[in-house]
Amino acid sequence: MTQASLIRLSELNNDAQYNLNDTSMYNPVGAAAYGVNGDKIGTVRDALVEPETGRIRYFLVDVGGWFSSKEVLVPVGYGRVDDSGVYFDSLTKDQVKDMSEYRADQAYSSEMMDTDERVLRGNQSQEEYHQRAYQTPDRLQLLEERLVVNKDRFKAGSVQIGKRIETRQETVSVPLQREEVVIERHAVTDGRAVEGAVLGEGHQTMSVDLEAERANISKQAYVTEEVSVGKRAVTETQQVTETVGREVLDVNQTGDVRTTEGTALTDDTTKRNI
């Protein structure tokens, strides 16, 4: 497997798909690295992993304890994970000296990989080397994807508030006064005679002016309501659904093997997921 098909473990965290800060996840970055006889050789700076599964394939080790300014890639099967660091029990100073120097700005080429294999393999067969080199250490925790949801603000809309005129018919009762003529007639009972008067002569006419009130209509604007506009934040819960993955161990047991529960497995090959 070439580096082209592997990515750095730190890049998984940058993609926010894997939570490397979770205590249930194993993150070797920053762990102390020890070589043969428990000699401290430096620090694990990073790891190369399969992007699809997150499985570690190489530890990127800064071997400053043996050689200044040199980083090498050590297959995961050569590491033994402990609370105090990662132990490469069979890794010697001479091997590290002959291994290819890894630089972040260059690919881990097939030539470099072959060189490191020859150095680490020694007298082992190629099959034995590959079986060991990429075998998961006894304690290597698995990565699990978890949803990381961020929030950003955007303009959801706008509200425009103005005024318009609406009309309605309004009826008001107004009391109005007017004058009317009152004619009073009184009968004369003493029958006085009018001397020299001839009927029809001296015709007289009386004129009376009448007054009346009329309604004068006008309109006046009054303040009936005041409107103030502001904003307030309301919180609503939105459910987000996405597919996430996690690593599971494929345990292959061959022959007469006992599990931690003490159950004997006698089938030739038994495979189960944990």
Swiss-Prot record:
Assigned GO CC terms: plasma membrane light-harvesting complex
Molecular function as annotated in GO: electron transporter, transferring electrons within the cyclic electron transport pathway of photosynthesis activity
UniProt feature coiled coil, ranges: none
A GO BP entry: photosynthesis, light reaction
InterPro entries in alphabetical order: Bac_photo_RC_H_C (IPR014747), DUF2382 (IPR019060), PRC-brl_dom (IPR027275), PRC_barrel-like_sf (IPR011033), Stress_Response_Assoc (IPR052967)
Pfam family, one: DUF2382
Cited PANTHER family: STRESS RESPONSE PROTEIN YSNF
Protein name (database record): Uncharacterized protein DR_1314
Organism: Deinococcus radiodurans (strain ATCC 13939 / DSM 20539 / JCM 16871 / CCUG 27074 / LMG 4051 / NBRC 15346 / NCIMB 9279 / VKM B-1422 / R1)
